[in-house]
């Protein structure tokens, strides 16, 4: 009787596809109450970093209202990354099992073009800071060795909402050559946004909760509860 080789690339790709599908289907139940839905204007208008990938095969936009000022949200964003403050998401997936920080870490408050926010522990080239405007926007991306343009970009944009609230808008874009683990393009188009939604929901709510808690402790928020996520 023939035995199945679960170490073969075919099985690895199949397993990855199944996991992506499972995560994607889970996201359908989570997103309904996730409070990360971008409004029509946010989904269609141009954001910083869009020009880096002109014709993406995929683009997803999420947004959340945070009950603290943008100046209080920004420190949580600039310290992100595995081995840094974490991604405020599922730490066993993207932070080596180490719990994401629940305080501002002064050693990670400096950012510059080329700074690395490791996607996972040990990563050296993803994600790299491609653009930034203090307290306004951060654009991360991955430029593979030998490439001159990013294959994927991730923009985080902060917009002030009176009084004392912030709208965090995040957009991920992928250009055609990017096919993780050799997955076919059609599968990448369908599964990647769904799987991404699971992670980004946790991540965005993590930023919101941490920022709001810190602002509340300092009694610095003037944002009415009616505007929250």
Protein language model annotation of sequence segments:
Residues 2-20:
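N-terminal Sec-pathway targeting helices
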Residues 15, 45-57, 65-71, 78-169, ...:
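Glycine-rich portal/gate segments that line the openings of hydrophobic small-molecule binding cavities
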Residues 184-188:
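Short glycine/proline- and charge-enriched loop/turn segments
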Residues 216-229:
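Short, flexible loop/turn segments with low-complexity composition
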Residues 189-194:
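Second-shell loop/turn segments in exported
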Residues 26-31, 35, 150, 160, ...:
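A solvent-exposed interaction/effector surface
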Residues 15-61:
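Short acidic N-proximal helix/loop "leader" segments that mark the beginning
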């Amino acid at each position: 009787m023939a035995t199945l080789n679960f170490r073969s690339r075919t099985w690895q790709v199949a397993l990855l596809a199944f996991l992506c599908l499972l995560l994607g289907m889970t996201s359908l139940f989570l997103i309904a109450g996730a409070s990360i839905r971008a409004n029509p204007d946010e989904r269609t208008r141009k954001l910083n970093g869009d020009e880096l990938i002109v014709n993406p095969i995929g683009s997803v936009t999420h947004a959340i209202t945070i009950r603290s000022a943008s100046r209080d949200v920004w420190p949580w964003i600039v310290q992100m990354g595995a081995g840094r403050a974490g991604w405020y998401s599922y730490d066993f997936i993207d932070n080596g099992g180490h719990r994401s920080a629940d305080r501002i870490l002064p050693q990670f408050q400096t950012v510059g073009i080329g700074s690395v926010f490791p996607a996972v522990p040990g990563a050296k080239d993803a994600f790299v800071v491609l653009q930034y405007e203090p307290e306004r926007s951060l654009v991360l991306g991955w430029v593979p060795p030998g490439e001159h343009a990013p294959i994927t970009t991730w923009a985080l944009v902060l917009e002030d909402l009176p009084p004392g609230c912030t709208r965090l808008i995040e957009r991920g874009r992928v250009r055609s050559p990017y096919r993780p683990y050799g997955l076919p393009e059609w599968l990448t188009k369908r599964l990647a946004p769904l799987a991404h939604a699971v992670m980004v929901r946790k991540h965005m709510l993590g930023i919101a909760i941490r920022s709001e808690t810190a602002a509340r402790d300092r009694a610095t928020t003037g944002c009415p509860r009616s505007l929250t996520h």
